[in-house]
Amino acid sequence: DDCLGMFSSCDPNNDKCCPNRKCSRKDQWCKYQLW
């Protein structure tokens, strides 16, 4: 499966962002997960 890169639009309920990234519920795109 291809993962979604930085700033790719995504679905918070079906997070397909790459490792160390998280789908932002507010902005609906993949952001770095800093925590």
Swiss-Prot record:
SUPFAM superfamilies the record matches: omega toxin-like
Coiled-coil annotated spans: none
Domain notes: The presence of a 'disulfide through disulfide knot' structurally defines this protein as a knottin.
Tissue specificity remark: Expressed by the venom gland.
Role summary: Gating-modifier toxin that inhibits both sodium (Nav) and calcium (Cav3) channels by inducing hyperpolarizing shift in voltage-dependence of activation and steady state inactivation. Inhibits Nav1.1/SCN1A, Nav1.2/SCN2A, Nav1.3/SCN3A, Nav1.6/SCN6A, Nav1.7/SCN9A and Cav3.1/CACNA1G sodium and calcium channels at nanomolar concentrations (IC(50)=81-301 nM). Surprisingly, selectively slows fast inactivation of Nav1.3/SCN3A. Also shows moderate inhibition of Cav3.2/CACNA1H calcium channels (IC(50)=1233 nM).
Family: Belongs to the neurotoxin 10 (Hwtx-1) family. 59 (Tltx) subfamily.
Miscellaneous field: Negative results: shows no or weak activity on Nav1.4/SCN4A, Nav1.5/SCN5A, and Cav3.3/CACNA1I sodium and calcium channels.
This protein's name: Mu/omega-theraphotoxin-Tap1a
Disulfide bond residue pairs: 3-18, 10-23, 17-30
UniProt keyword annotation of Cytoplasm present: no
Keywords, ordered alphabetically: Calcium channel impairing toxin, Disulfide bond, Ion channel impairing toxin, Knottin, Neurotoxin, Pharmaceutical, Secreted, Toxin, Voltage-gated calcium channel impairing toxin, Voltage-gated sodium channel impairing toxin
Domain of life, source organism: Eukaryota
Any single Gene Ontology cellular-component annotation: extracellular region
Secreted listed as a keyword: yes
Organism: Theraphosa apophysis (Goliath pinkfoot tarantula)
